[in-house]
Every structure is written in structure tokens, then in C-alpha cells.
Regions:
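Short basic helix-loop element that most often maps to the first helix and adjoining turn
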Residues: 11-26, 30
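Conserved hydrophobic/aromatic packing and binding residues within compact polymer-binding modules
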Residues: 13, 27-28, 38-41, 67
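Residues within helix-turn-helix
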Residues: 25, 36, 54
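Recognition helix of helix-turn-helix/homeodomain-like DNA-binding domains
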Residues: 32-48
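DNA major-groove recognition helix of helix-turn-helix/homeodomain DNA-binding modules
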Residues: 51-66
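Short, charged recognition helix plus adjacent turn
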Residues: 58, 68-79
């Protein structure tokens, strides 16, 4: 998976978290994820499972698509 995809996803997650005025710790609690994992997502270091994407979306009260804003489906994978 392209690192730019992970970075864009992480930036979106951070932007949405800050919009809700949540700390990483608060988001972690709401999404049932570890605070270190939230930090890794925001830095583009974590490749999330579908379940964790849904958890994050619910905790942020956003559409799943909002987390993928700016990510093109035509990007090639660089594994």
C-alpha cells in the first residue's frame, strides 16, 4: 500500500479529530483503540483493518468516505 495513502488517511483522521475537539486519548477511548495506535494512524504508520476504520468513523461521527478524502482509487500499490 502506498505510504501516501496512509499519510493522507492519517491527516484526514487528525483533522476530523481536531474538528470534534478530541484528544488522541479521548478518540482512543471512543473507538476502543489504543492511544498509541491512534497516533500511528495519524502519522501514516498504520494500515487499518476494516473493523478499525468503522470504529474510527463511528467515534469521529463522520462518514467512512470522509477518512478517505483526497485518496485516488487509481493510485498504484508500491507494497
Amino acid at each position: 500500500m502506498s505510504k501516501s495513502i496512509l499519510k493522507t488517511f492519517g491527516s484526514n483522521a487528525r483533522r476530523l479529530r481536531l474538528r470534534r475537539k478530541l484528544t488522541q486519548e479521548q478518540l482512543a477511548e471512543l473507538s476502543f483503540l489504543h492511544p498509541n495506535y491512534i497516533g500511528g494512524i495519524e502519522r501514516g504508520e498504520r494500515n487499518l483493518s476494516l473493523i478499525n476504520i468503522v470504529r474510527l468513523s463511528r467515534a469521529l461521527q463522520c462518514r467512512i468516505g470522509d477518512l478517505f478524502a483526497g485518496i485516488s482509487t487509481s493510485e498504484k500499490s508500491d507494497n
